Amino acid sequence: MKVLVLFSVLFLTLFSYSSTEAIDEFDSDAEDDMLSLMANEQVRAKACTPRLHDCSHDRHSCCRGELSKDVCYCFYPEGEDKTEVCSCQQPKSHKYIEKVVDKAKTVVG
């Protein structure tokens, strides 16, 4: 009976060791594959639309200002046909906040 317990403990120890080695090898191979894929990956950032330019093609493409991102506003100009015109603009609240921050920067130093 003692021999059976001894062999079962030995078997479990060897089994856990071998399974850990296999998992470690699998993880290292997966890490190597991921690193090689990341090395081949190219950055594909979209070009942003500058302030006061047309953003009707992509309404989420406006560039960032100093503190916040500009917003694409769409409107219908007066006296023209019913075509919608969109442009990237800075919200008034953000404009005021940037002015306050600029004043604070000049006061503080």
From Swiss-Prot:
Give the GO cellular component terms, alphabetically.
Answer: extracellular region
Coiled coil regions, renumbered to chain: none
Start and end residues of each stretch annotated as Knottin domain: 45-88
Known tissue expression: Expressed by the venom gland.
Region annotated Linear cationic cytotoxin domain sits at 89-108
What are the UniProt keywords, alphabetically? Answer: Calcium channel impairing toxin, Disulfide bond, Ion channel impairing toxin, Knottin, Secreted, Signal, Toxin
| Entry's localization field | Secreted
Q: What is its main location?
A: secreted
Q: Name one GO molecular function term.
A: calcium channel regulator activity
Where does the signal sequence lie?
Answer: 1-22
Q: Which residues form the propeptide?
A: 23-44
Disulfide bonds listed in the record: C48-C63, C55-C72, C62-C88, C74-C86
- Pfam families associated with the record: Toxin_35
Q: What does this protein do?
A: Enhances the high-affinity desensitization of human P2RX3 purinoceptors.
Tell what the record comments on domains. Answer: The toxin is composed of 2 domains: a highly rigid N-terminal inhibitor cystine knot (knottin) domain and a rather flexible C-terminal linear cationic cytotoxin domain that forms amphiphilic alpha-helices. The presence of a 'disulfide through disulfide knot' structurally defines this protein as a knottin.
Family stated for the protein in its record: Belongs to the neurotoxin 19 (CSTX) family. 05 (U4-Lctx) subfamily.
- In its UniProt entry, what is this protein called? U4-lycotoxin-Ls1b
Which species is this UniProt entry from? Lycosa singoriensis (Wolf spider)
